[in-house]
Amino acid sequence: MLKNPATKYRSFKPIDLTDRQWPSRTITRPPIWMSTDLRDGNQSLFEPMDAQRKMRMFKTLVQIGFKEIEVAFPSASQTDFNFVRELIEGGHIPDDVTIEVLTQARDDLIERTFESLRGVPRAIVHLYNATAPEFRKIVFNLEKSGVKELAQNAARTMKRIAATMPETQFTFQYSPEVFSGTEIEFAKEVCDAVFDIWEPTPEHKAIVNLPATVEMSTPNIYADQIEWMHRNLKRRDSLVISVHPHNDRGTAVAAAELAVMAGADRIEGCLFGNGERTGNVDLVTLALNLYTQGVDPGLDFSNINEVARTAEECTQLPIHPRHPYVGDLVFTAFSGSHQDAIKKGFAVQKPDAMWEVPYMPIDPADLGRTYDSVIRVNSQSGKGGIAYLLEQGYGVVLPRRLQVDFSSAVQRFTDDSGQEVTSAQIWELFQQEYVQNATPVHYVGHSLSERDGREHIKLTVDINGTRRVLNGAGNGPLDALMHAIGVPVRIQHYEERALTQGADARAVAVAEMAGADVTGSAFGVGIDANLVTASIRAVISGVNRAYARVNAQAKERFFEAAMNDATESVGV
């Protein structure tokens, strides 16, 4: 690093806005939310989502409550084009959801973009071109007039093509890319020129998106930029001001919140902050920040763990354990004083009272989560902690979510005994909780065979003391097992590893089970010399623990399929 960074880096020039109003404002209603997980988020992945993962993400976004979703850059690839067509032709777009597509300012790309939208009832077409000085000079070699003319020509093309598709209600959106680094007066000039061509009205508004494509300043300066545009744009009553903050300086959430205070109506971002470089603004954090201030965000994260697992599986990116609201350690306290304060807070918290639990800005139950403290089990252990003792003493490496889950059982044990717990006691308790759980389903044995390219299982179990032989088929042993047992839960996560090495090696398998009637998720662990047997034992243990977490009505029908006369169940 340079001793004098001023020789290489310029400080950002503030906006002359001495009478700024945003610092005295508060946010009392949610902005319009626009998810760009399928476009900006997807293009930033090591391996972009395939069609199946894209569809899963789209349906998750709809379920959460997003009404505007940027789904593709149709002119960029045949894959994106085909996905838009599948959404339209497959009837996947709900009546209250509007899809958005992105296009650069070139006639052929615009034409291709509109072609992808044929037959859609309504859509947002998002036009952009870069306006910042370094892009004008280095990337495009254009003067200001050339950049403005490029945007105007593209705007005319969009208006002309849209007129030939009267069956679709189009909303036009324009972004001066790298707005955050563009001279503010020039950004206004280009935006005004585009909207003079589109001629939006208060009844049929256009969207002006003002992105911090690269976050270059403190959030207050971005807020000044937004307020200046809010005051000075022509046709303000016919425009929706949108912001698209990136997180290069780590302050995208603050920038978005201040931008709304400064006059923005709409925010573009991604779940959990996915996106180019350091990511787009995290829409989950923004929404739940509003929620903790008593404002309904209009997005439903009442099962945030499910949303998180979907996002991780679709993007192949892990969520940081300290990520606000959703990280595995967010509702975990290692400090004894923190644990004590939280425990006392829960003890006095009334169900209908205002939330006042120390160290916890939100009730984890509102997100479908629980408070679990990962306790320091033995001060003599050096590194301390349950996971450390199990790994060092018994070779069991706990996934983080299982570590948090098991810590509750250990906490109950230590509370009841009032004594320090030993590693041997932890191991015995672990086996009782997750490995030896044989009620109501007790594993007896199984056999596997392969026919017609599918795995077939013959599973012998005792269910509430009654011997049953169950048959199923699937794409692998676990798929076949789930079809055989026929319970209303699914394998949400599965992992396996060697427990010991050598001729007498044993394997440990961990299955995380979830279902509509199951509170949270339920873990099962299997340990056996045979890996497949270990995995079957893990799933059955997880099924037993899931059964314990459903209500009485769900319990009555939980094993209906298995208790009927067994016929082979084949997965599609």
Curated annotation (Swiss-Prot):
It is found in: Cytoplasm. It holds the Pfam family LeuA_dimer. GO terms for biological process: L-leucine biosynthetic process. Its EC number is 2.3.3.13. CDD domains: DRE_TIM_LeuA. It catalyses: 3-methyl-2-oxobutanoate + acetyl-CoA + H2O = (2S)-2-isopropylmalate + CoA + H(+). Keywords: Amino-acid biosynthesis, Branched-chain amino acid biosynthesis, Cytoplasm, Leucine biosynthesis, Magnesium, Metal-binding, Transferase. Signal peptide: none annotated. Its cofactor is Mg(2+). Pathway: Amino-acid biosynthesis; L-leucine biosynthesis; L-leucine from 3-methyl-2-oxobutanoate: step 1/4. Residues 437-572 are annotated as: Regulatory domain. InterPro entries: 2-isopropylmalate_synth_dimer, AIPM/Hcit_synth_CS, Aldolase_TIM, IPM_Synthase, LeuA-like_post-cat, LeuA_allosteric_dom_sf, LeuA_N_DRE-TIM, PYR_CT. GO terms for cellular component: cytoplasm. Mg(2+) binds at residues 40, 244, 246, 280. The keyword Membrane does not apply. Residues 31-305 form the Pyruvate carboxyltransferase domain. The keyword Cytoplasm applies. It comes from the Bacteria. One of its GO terms (molecular function) is 2-isopropylmalate synthase activity. Homodimer. Catalyzes the condensation of the acetyl group of acetyl-CoA with 3-methyl-2-oxobutanoate (2-ketoisovalerate) to form 3-carboxy-3-hydroxy-4-methylpentanoate (2-isopropylmalate). Belongs to the alpha-IPM synthase/homocitrate synthase family. LeuA type 2 subfamily. This is 2-isopropylmalate synthase. The lineage of its organism: Bacteria, Pseudomonadati, Pseudomonadota, Betaproteobacteria, Burkholderiales.
